[in-house]
Amino acid sequence: FYVSLANPHRSREFARGMGIMTKTDKVDAYMLACYAFLKNPHRWEPPAPEIRYLGALLRRRDVLLGDALREENRLEKYLSTDTPADIISSCMHMAQLLRDEVSNIERQIKAHIKASPALRRDYTLLTSIKSVGPQLGMHMLVVLRSHDFSSAEQAAAFLGVVPIEKRSGTSVRSRPRMSKIGPPQLRAKLYMSALCGKIYNKRMRNIYDEMCLRGKPKMVAIGALMRKLVHWCYGVLKTGIVFNDEGLKQVLST
């Protein structure tokens, strides 16, 4: 036998589709057996150790950065109110400690990537795409090397940047919207990179302007740029070729 990691939301929706509302160990075992038989999910392979370690470092950095921002917001509030000096001093000390630890983790991340030829190569390929910066590049590296995506479309669907259409019948007819499943933190980084790309990346700017001229809402055009970034990231890792506007057309085109 082999192990497969099923999406818990999808497996639960599968159970509801079978008319199973009860949730016990015995019922779950039966439902998962039916799910595996009918869906034949992919075999799960653990990521390489260097990918797992990089992912752990990135998650730790994000947690520390969030804590540092919250502490700095508290400090701003304390400075604008009648707060005792000891409290302000404690808050300033804690904010500085958190910032120092963020810097320490970032140094570890850079050293880890530099020490691994495979990570260094993949990182160079990803950041060869204009508007893919260090943070997006490292996070996309972890996602794309942790999952065996068969296509760029599958990677985009995993990250929740594909449109969902509801046009069946009249009662459910609505505008297409982004699915927004998957990791929201990475989707936020894609959004910021898309905003940067529509200004500084000529190809992305042309895509954005063309969609706006066709009457598409601006947010729809931004979503298309986010999707395009995922396709390009998948393409450079799939081919092992540094990104350029002329090459890789068969893999990078959407």
Annotate each predicted stretch with a short phrase.
Residues K39-W44, R145-F149, C196-R203, V230-D245:
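Short helix-capping/linker segments at secondary-structure and domain boundaries
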Residues F1-L125:
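Long, charge-rich intrinsically disordered scaffolds of nucleic-acid metabolism proteins
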Residues R43-G55, L79, T83, S174-R177, ...:
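Short, solvent-exposed helix-loop connector elements
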Residues P134, H139-R214, K218, S253-T254:
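Phosphate-backbone recognition surface of nucleic-acid-processing proteins
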Residues L213-T254:
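Basic, amphipathic alpha-helical segments enriched in Lys/Arg and hydrophobic/aromatic residues
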Residues N7, D28, L32, L64, ...:
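Short, conserved catalytic/metal-binding motifs centered on acidic residues
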Residues Y35, M140, K189-A194, L225, ...:
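Short alpha-helical scaffolding segments that buttress acidic/His motifs in well-ordered protein cores
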